[in-house]
């Protein structure tokens, strides 16, 4: 019975992993991509338990368990050249959450140059602008009451800012240029695409199309770029990995930790949904998840440093012909 239970658990974990690999956009299949850490922990436990029995099923169970395990990065910044570094904070506030002071206190403590808040309505916009408007005078305000509002606050000069609705009229995104203290220009994209879920969308098409459309633009721009936001997707999903190859962007978390930002209320069910992606022109100063403040997301804080001379140290992902075909099919 013990051996059968181990084998059944192994097969269940393998099934969820296989479902996540199926190239369809149904929400329940895409949901299978999220719990990789939980699956990995259960797989490791199953593998360990399988070693205590001499039953021939052990080898099959162990193989199935280990087949769902896997890993990988952006170079660390060196001291100096602070005028080329951008400390930034990203936070999904959860619209009905009214603990604005919990977030504002953390912003004032860490003093990031860029603050992006998501799910912000008029109430949140007023609270944040009242507290941050003097210290972060460059503001892009897009309040909405549909969970897709966003506000951008900056101490650095911003240029050429546009609020776009790339795929759907009720889903905004922010695009423009950050002017570093050194005078150099960095392209910025801030996104919060609609997720695949029973309440939002039956498929992941809208999310995937928005992400890949911006990724294609980043690749064509070819200059230094940052992409930040709640992407409603995990770092290891097929779509996010396709995005990194198409855009050429790197994930600072790889090789450093999960930095899971959602769900703040469920310790065992957390995934990294809030992202900071960078092109090869950057190095990482520091990265950390901040404190819970009543939202279902934790804020995330990172310092990215513009060091184009170190671009060759980073392993920039590149798309193949199949990737390009996938992008064309998704966008069109």
Q: Model-flagged regions — what are they?
A:
Residues 3-6, 30, 55-62:
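Short, aromatic-rich membrane-interface segments at the entry and exit
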Residues 52, 58-110, 126-130:
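N-terminal signal-anchor transmembrane helix
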Residues 84, 94-108, 116-332:
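Soluble catalytic domains of enzymes that build or remodel membrane lipids, polysaccharides, and related
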Residues 29-45:
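Loop-to-helix transition at the N-terminal end of transmembrane alpha-helices
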Residues 46-54:
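Hydrophobic alpha-helical transmembrane segments
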Residues 8-25:
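N-terminal signal-anchor/start-transfer transmembrane helix
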Residues 113:
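Short acidic/polar active-site loop segments enriched in Thr and Asp
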């Amino acid at each position: 019975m013990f051996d059968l239970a181990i084998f059944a658990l192994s097969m269940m974990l393998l099934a969820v992993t296989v479902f996540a690999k199926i190239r369809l956009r149904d929400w329940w299949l895409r949901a299978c991509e999220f719990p990789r850490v939980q699956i990995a922990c259960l797989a490791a436990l199953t593998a360990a338990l399988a070693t205590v029995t001499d039953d021939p099923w052990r080898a099959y169970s162990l193989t199935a368990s280990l087949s769902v395990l896997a890993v990988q990065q952006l170079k660390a910044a060196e001291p100096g050249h602070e005028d080329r570094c951008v400390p930034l904070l990203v936070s999904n506030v959860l619209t009905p959450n009214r603990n604005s002071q919990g977030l504002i206190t953390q912003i004032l403590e860490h003093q990031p140059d860029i603050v992006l808040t998501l799910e912000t309505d008029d109430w949140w916009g007023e609270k944040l602008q009242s507290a941050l408007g003097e210290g972060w005078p460059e503001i892009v305000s897009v309040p909405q009451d549909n969970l897709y509002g966003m506000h951008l606050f900056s101490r650095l000069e911003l240029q050429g800012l546009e609020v776009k609705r790339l795929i759907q009229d009720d889903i905004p995104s922010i695009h423009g240029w950050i002017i570093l203290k050194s005078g150099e220009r960095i392209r910025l994209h801030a996104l919060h695409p609609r997720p695949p879920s029973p309440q939002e969308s039956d498929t992941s098409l809208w999310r995937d199309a928005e992400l890949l459309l911006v990724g294609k633009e980043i690749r064509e721009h070819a200059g230094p770029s940052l992409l930040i936001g709640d992407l409603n997707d995990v770092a290891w999903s097929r779509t996010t990995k396709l995005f990194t190859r198409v855009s050429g962007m790197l994930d600072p978390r790889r090789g450093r930790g999960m930095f899971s930002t959602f769900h703040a209320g469920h310790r065992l069910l957390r995934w990294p949904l809030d992202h900071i992606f960078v092109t090869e022109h950057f190095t990482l100063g520091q990265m950390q998840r901040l404190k819970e403040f009543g939202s279902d997301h934790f804020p995330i804080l990172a310092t990215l440093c513009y060091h184009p001379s170190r671009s060759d140290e980073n392993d920039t992902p590149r798309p193949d012909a199949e990737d390009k075909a996938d992008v064309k099919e998704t966008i069109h």
